[in-house]
């Protein structure tokens, strides 16, 4: 089964920005209700896109530098990053099919 990647301030450059695959990064926090609702969806997406895209989660409380760098104000916010650049952004606990559609636009 696919597992989402735990993104951090330390590994963001090498694992996310330098990745040759499209990366979905879910910015979340443990105190955020909608983030918790989105959690299982992110895990399902990690399964669905195993080998095709990287699905990552970044805890904004533990990794304030990256969250600040991308101006993340409300969570959950999801960024799709490809070739080191943000190519898409979604805010809120969206349904899985909407998120998947966005990822699909940036794969391949």
UniProtKB/Swiss-Prot annotation:
Domain of life: Bacteria
PROSITE patterns: THIOREDOXIN_1, THIOREDOXIN_2
Record's keyword terms, sorted: Disulfide bond, Electron transport, Redox-active center, Transport
SUPFAM superfamilies given in the database record: Thioredoxin-like (SSF52833)
Official protein name in the record: Thioredoxin
Gene3D superfamilies: Glutaredoxin
UniProt keyword annotation of Disulfide bond present: yes
Organism: Chlorobaculum thiosulfatiphilum
Record PANTHER family: GEO12009P1
UniProt function note: Participates in various redox reactions through the reversible oxidation of its active center dithiol to a disulfide and catalyzes dithiol-disulfide exchange reactions.
Any Pfam family the entry gives: Thioredoxin
Family: Belongs to the thioredoxin family.
Gene Ontology terms: cellular component: cytosol
Disulphide bonds in the chain: 32-35
Residue ranges constituting the Thioredoxin domain according to the UniProt record: 2-108
GO molecular function, one term: protein-disulfide reductase activity
InterPro entries, sorted: Thioredoxin, Thioredoxin-like_sf, Thioredoxin_CS, Thioredoxin_domain
GO biological process: cell redox homeostasis
Taxonomy of the source species: Bacteria, Pseudomonadati, Chlorobiota, Chlorobiia, Chlorobiales
């Amino acid at each position: 089964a696919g597992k989402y990647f735990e993104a951090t301030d330390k590994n963001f450059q090498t694992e996310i920005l330098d990745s040759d695959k499209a990366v979905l990064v879910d910015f979340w926090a443990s105190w955020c209700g909608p983030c918790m609702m989105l959690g299982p969806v992110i895990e399902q997406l990690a399964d669905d896109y195993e080998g095709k895209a990287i699905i990552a989660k970044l805890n904004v409380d533990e990794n304030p530098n990256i969250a600040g760098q991308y101006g993340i104000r409300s969570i959950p916010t999801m960024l799709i990053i490809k070739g080191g650049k943000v190519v898409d952004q979604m805010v809120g606990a969206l349904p899985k099919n909407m998120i998947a559609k966005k990822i699909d636009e940036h794969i391949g």
